[in-house]
Curated annotation (Swiss-Prot):
Cofactor list: Mg(2+)
Name recorded for this polypeptide: Exonuclease mut-7 homolog
Protein species of origin: Homo sapiens
InterPro entries: 3'-5'_exonuclease_dom, Exonuclease_MUT-7-like, Mut-7_DEDDy_dom, Mut7-C_RNAse_dom, RNaseH-like_sf, RNaseH_sf
Keyword Transport: no
Length: 876
């Protein structure tokens, strides 16, 4: 007898007879649903579907029977609908004919079920019953009702599922979602509808216009006015508009207000660079500002206000005169100074040459004669100097300059490639050499660069070299992906990171002019910083001015001098002794990570979603950092990572849900922490704190995997003693030991003084080495947690509230199950003095040690069989 034949199995036959009745099938599935046996449940469901005379009508019978049964978590009704959808797709039989009478009858029933069911049923019902072709009037009425009830998310989701967007429109459905910061849902709503996408952009762009107040819109939706509207400020919203504009391929003319806001943001940035950081020359500042402001009256007014806020009236008037700003758009004090300058015939210059000379004395100076800086703009120039550029066994510094782009859609293109060798600097004019793309100059340039980068005997020095070289492909197609051909490269960005992590003291500078990047590295190694005032200049202008030539040469030549200094005294900078011989560093790449061969470290990941992989600076081991000396601040998207790092003893601060990512930069600067972030803020944060002080973490990894990646990246040493040396909740590293008898007494006093406590909020907040629960696991034999901390004394507690420390911290005793007090071998508890959490020895310690065993330093493990330590004396 075939065991697979229902006729040979009485129980199976009974199931088939039962399955012909949809309600009996539902009853059987409800019984299995409570057991959570998903495999058995699926098999029973599919057998039942096959036995139903009409599976579609049977589904509706079951759903109608389930109406009104709402609960938390996944519903059985939604699961059955999804399973029938899968079952139908696996059947060879055709579905009901479109527009047939039978299908219309089923659609009418399905629409009625849908209007009385949770949103999770929408997708499977729409697929099974082809609801996109059903009577849309009932569906539209239901969506409008959801919207009227303030269930905006459900209305938009259902409308998109049923393809009702054309009838529903975009303004009505998207405005309340935008007010609730549900941009992703709005994007899904308009996906596949180009006309709606354009209307959405027009709507969002209208909110970016000068003088617009988003609160006027929010007042029409009282259900969402309590939410924060910061993300809908013109500055933030314009970023979203420009992102969607590029994604949808919409012409920039459709979003003029967002472009204006972007130009205003660029003006703020340039004013900060010029007047606060003083890292931009007046000439370059004027050049960029004129291009941004143009003839826009509103931008002229905004620029006038920026000038007044960043400088005095005299300086503001000088700038206004150079920029030809209309006098009527200037504040009164600035207008007075401007009229005075015009009477004099020119703006007074306060001995700027003397100031420039003083500035030059403070910065790194090019140590070679000016005649040793060569500008190569033709294939003949390249041929003449090819021997010097490609000389074997030499060290060269490589850098690229490009004109910054301040408007959306622009792509920076390289203008100049600098190659420094001992005693000389060669400035390769990329603009001249790359035109025409198939010309003799372009071919000679591409061939020379490829030879230089692929020769392993030539050590190429750079600072973020990969990011620089990637731009060469935009001007020279033959050099696309040239960064992957690098052999014998050394990126000083990684070396700088190791120096910073090893606590090489940064120079004491004015906070506003705080050094970063290569300028800071030059300051730390050579004693004077690199002058970056020409960095944002117009590198496409020809001929280059003398200041640009000197800056470009110094930018590349300083790499040679930094490398020489590091090789002479590596110990001074906490680097490996064999740094001088490190031309082909050994790689320690994480599986799946892509890096160009022969390069020590990429400047930044192509997309800031993945943790850059640490690579040794030399054949020797990179400097290690003890876990307890490693200090980080995590943004609010990485709170799980912060808790995992605390679990291993790392001092990890985390931002609250309401704190902006700019707060991370403030904390990092004030407390000397490294920023761990994810997503778009990475590049902005890295620019604020400097190279090596900000890391982008892959959000697709679990928290413990993220922790491993971060610790490996910074070469952090973790020992068994570090595990749980910090409180995972508050980051405090101070504990008090509490004996078991004392804990019994405290729990008894607390319960009798305040009455029985609920194990709700406090219980869920209290977390321990052994997770709180009614029946805790015992710790593995010999696996103990013994913190060197003092024992809790009665004098440490307040007399009137025995569960509160003298400083006001309340011990979270409600999180300790009574059963834990009876655990054999449990000697004591640990109380965090920062937040009052209670911890105790349990199986969680062993699990953490096992999970991170490849990270733990070889040392005696508390999880190896050994006599459990006990206190020399007990005060109780």
């Amino acid at each position: 007898m075939d065991p697979g034949d229902p006729a040979g199995d009485p129980a199976a036959g009974e199931r088939h007879r039962m399955g012909r009745d949809p309600l009996l099938l539902l009853q059987a599935l409800q019984t299995l649903w409570s057991t959570r046996e998903r495999k058995q449940l699926r098999e029973e469901a599919w057998r039942g579907f096959a036995a139903l005379d009409d599976p579609l009508a049977g589904l509706l019978d079951m759903l109608e029977s389930c109406r009104g049964q709402r609960g938390e978590g996944p519903s059985l009704a939604a699961w059955i609908s999804h399973q029938l959808q899968c079952w139908l797709q696996a059947q060879p039989c055709p579905s009901l004919a479109q527009h047939s009478l039978r299908l219309k009858q089923l659609q009418a029933r399905a629409v009625k079920v849908l209007t009385e069911s949770p949103p999770s049923l929408a997708a499977p019902l729409a697929s099974i019953f082809q609801l996109q072709d059903a009577d849309r009037s009932c569906l539209l009425a239901h969506v409008h009702r959801l919207h009227h009830e303030g269930r905006f998310r459900e209305a938009a989701t259902l409308g998109a599922t049923l393809k009702l967007q054309s009838e529903l429109g975009v303004e009505k459905m998207s405005i309340p979602l935008l007010l609730q910061d549900k941009v992703a849902l709005v994007e899904r709503y308009v996906a596949g509808f180009p006309d709606l996408q354009r209307r959405l952009l027009v709507l969002m762009d209208s909110w970016c216009q000068p003088g617009f107040d988003i609160k006027d819109v929010a007042r029409r939706y009282p259900e969402v006015t309590s939410l924060s509207l910061e993300k809908l400020s013109p500055k933030a919203l314009s970023r979203q508009v420009l992102r969607l504009q590029e994604r949808y391929g919409v012409a920039p003319a459709l979003c003029p207000n967002a472009a204006i806001q972007q130009r205003l943001a660029a003006l703020r940035h340039l004013c900060h660079k010029r007047f606060v950081e003083k890292s931009l020359s007046q000439e370059n500042w004027t050049d960029h500002v004129q291009g941004l402001v143009g003839q826009s009256p509103w931008l002229q007014e905004q620029l006038s206000q920026l000038l007044v806020s960043h400088s005095d009236p005299v300086t503001a008037a000088q700038c206004a005169m150079e920029l030809l700003l209309p006098e009527e758009r200037l504040p009164a004090a600035v207008a007075v100074e401007l009229r005075r300058f015009r009477l004099q015939g020119r703006a007074t210059e306060a001995d700027s040459r003397l100031e420039v000379k003083d500035m030059k004395d403070r910065y790194y100076q090019l140590p070679i004669p000016r005649e040793n800086v060569h500008l190569l703009a033709s294939w003949e120039d390249l041929t003449r100097h090819e021997g010097a550029l490609l000389q074997c066994h030499q060290v060269v510094g490589v850098d690229v300059e490009w004109t910054p782009v301040f408007v959306a859609g622009g792509r920076p293109r390289p203008s100049l490639l600098q190659v420094a060798v001992e005693g000389h600097v060669f400035l390769l004019d990329v603009l001249a050499l790359s035109q025409p793309p198939t010309g003799q100059g372009a071919q000679a340039f591409s061939r020379l660069v490829a030879q230089l980068l692929s020769d392993p005997s030539i050590t190429k020095l750079g600072y973020g070299m990969v990011g620089d070289l990637q731009k060469l492909g935009t001007s020279c197609p033959a050099l696309a992906h040239v960064e992957k051909q690098i052999l014998g490269g050394m990126d000083l960005l990684l070396v700088h990171r190791q120096m910073r992590v090893a606590s090489v003291p940064a120079p004491a500078v004015d906070r506003a002019r705080e050094l970063r990047g290569l300028s800071l590295l030059v300051q730390q190694v050579l004693g004077t910083a690199l002058d970056k005032t020409q960095q944002l200049s117009n590198w496409d202008r020809r001929p280059l001015c003398e200041e640009q030539v000197i800056y470009a040469a110094a930018d590349a030549y300083c790499l040679l001098e930094v490398h020489q200094a590091l090789c002479r005294e590596p110990a001074r900078f906490h680097l490996s002794e064999d740094l001088a011989g490190s031309r082909r560093p050994r790689h320690r790449e994480r599986p799946g990570a892509r890096k160009p061969p022969g390069l020590q470290k990429a400047s930044a990941p192509a997309a800031p979603r993945q943790v850059p992989v640490a690579v040794a600076v030399s054949e020797g081991a990179a400097p290690q950092i003890p876990a307890r000396a490693f200090r980080v601040v995590c943004d609010n998207m990485l709170q799980g990572l912060a808790r995992s790092l605390r679990c291993l003893g790392v001092d990890a601060r985390m931002l609250g849900n309401g704190e902006d990512h700019r707060r991370a930069a403030e904390v990092a600067r004030q407390e000397g922490r490294i920023i761990l972030t994810s997503g778009q803020p990475f590049h902005k944060l890295r620019a604020q704190v400097g190279a090596g002080r900000c890391l982008s973490v892959d959000c697709s990894l679990k928290a413990q995997q993220q922790a491993k990646a971060v610790l490996k990246h910074f070469n952090v040493r973790v020992t068994h003693a570090d595990i749980f040396s910090r409180c995972q909740a508050c980051n405090c590293d101070q504990y008090l030991k509490v004996s078991r008898d004392m804990m019994k007494q405290l729990m008894w006093l607390s319960s009798h003084q305040e009455g029985p406590r609920s194990s709700g909020d406090e219980a869920t907040q209290s977390q321990a080495v052994q997770e709180p629960g009614p029946a805790p696991d015992a710790a593995p034999e010999g696996c103990t947690y013994d913190r060197p901390c003092r024992w809790l004394q009665m004098a440490d507690l307040r007399a009137e509230t025995p569960d509160m420390l003298a400083d006001g911290t309340r011990l979270q005793l409600a999180g300790v199950p009574v059963g834990v007090l009876r655990t054999p071998g449990l000697r004591c508890f640990y109380c965090c003095t920062g937040c009052g959490k209670v911890f105790w020895d349990g199986s969680h310690l062993g699990r953490v040690a096992t999970h991170f065993r490849d990270m733990l330093e070889s040392a005696p493990s508390p999880c190896e069989p050994s006599p459990a330590p006990s206190p020399a004396s007990s005060p109780f």
